[in-house]
A protein has these predicted regions:
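Membrane-embedded transport module
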Residues: 12-72, 86, 91-234
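Basic, alpha-helical nucleic-acid-binding regions used in initiation and control of genome expression
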Residues: 83
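Substrate-recognition element of Asp-dependent hydrolases with the DxDx(T/V) motif
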Residues: 1-7, 69-70
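Conserved cytosolic catalytic loops of P-type ATPases
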Residues: 79
Length: 234
């Protein structure tokens, strides 16, 4: 019943005193809504009780139509349509074989805390990849810029082939190892989920691109100035 579902949600921290009837709906009431009405309602929903398999599947599809990344957990045969429709379907280790086949991941220890920990590790790894890309692309921007500018102003190539190989092979290898070994942090759980679909987030964000080109331009100016000074003194 809605009262039972509300009490369970309150005990696990989903339902709060600020929530109202707009945050809960039953399966029959959800089915009676048009697609336009349901699309507006799903953003505020916290509880859906007495839901049929088609109701769960429709909820997933409506969220996906709004560029949401949807994960669904379930252990029964009636959860299979929603598990298959979601971007990530998670079945319980003790669940039915139908649920496991429809899901992408099976939680062997049947613990929801494992989902949170897996998300934390995945987000931390994604952030480490972004850190490496900032380092790698900044170096490449600077290296290309000083070689190009050096040739244009008649200095020749400031970097030899050996130096370029050193930068791209030796330095990058150690940097990749260092950045990849950074431990996961729970702070990543405060980040908003990345968008998917046609308007999804690219791994290089606008702030990262600004950081790469801003830092690259700064170091290019410093290195060209140093080369000009050394050439003049020499």
């Amino acid at each position: 019943t809605p009262a039972t579902a509300r009490e369970i949600a309150r005990q696990i921290g989903i339902w709060t005193q600020e929530d109202s009837d707009k945050n809960i709906i039953t399966g029959p009431a959800f089915e009676a809504l048009s697609d336009e009405e349901a699309a507006k309602r799903v953003q505020s929903l916290k509880i859906m009780c007495r839901a049929r398999p088609t109701d769960k599947q429709r909820l997933v599809q409506l969220l996906q139509s709004q560029d949401a990344v949807v994960a669904v957990t379930g252990d029964g045969t009636n959860d299979a349509p929603a598990l298959k429709a979601a971007q990530v379907g998670l079945s319980m280790g003790d669940g039915t074989s139908v649920a496991k086949e429809a899901s992408d991941i099976t939680i062997l220890d049947n613990s929801f805390s494992s989902i949170v920990q897996a998300v934390m590790w995945g987000r931390s790894l994604y952030r480490n990849i972004q850190r490496f890309l900032i380092f790698q692309l900044t170096i490449n921007v600077v290296a290309c810029a000083i070689v190009l500018i050096g040739s244009l102003i008649g200095m020749g190539s400031p970097l030899t082939i050996t130096q370029m190989l050193w930068v791209n092979l030796i330095m990058d290898t150690f940097a990749a190892g260092a950045l990849a070994s950074l431990p996961p942090s729970w702070s990543v759980m405060r980040d908003r989920p990345r968008r998917s679909g046609e308007h999804g987030d690219f791994i290089i964000s606008k702030s990262m691109a600004g950081n790469i080109f801003g830092t690259g331009i700064f170091f290019t100016i410093v290195l060209i100035a140093a080369l000009l000074i050394l050439q003049k003194d020499g």
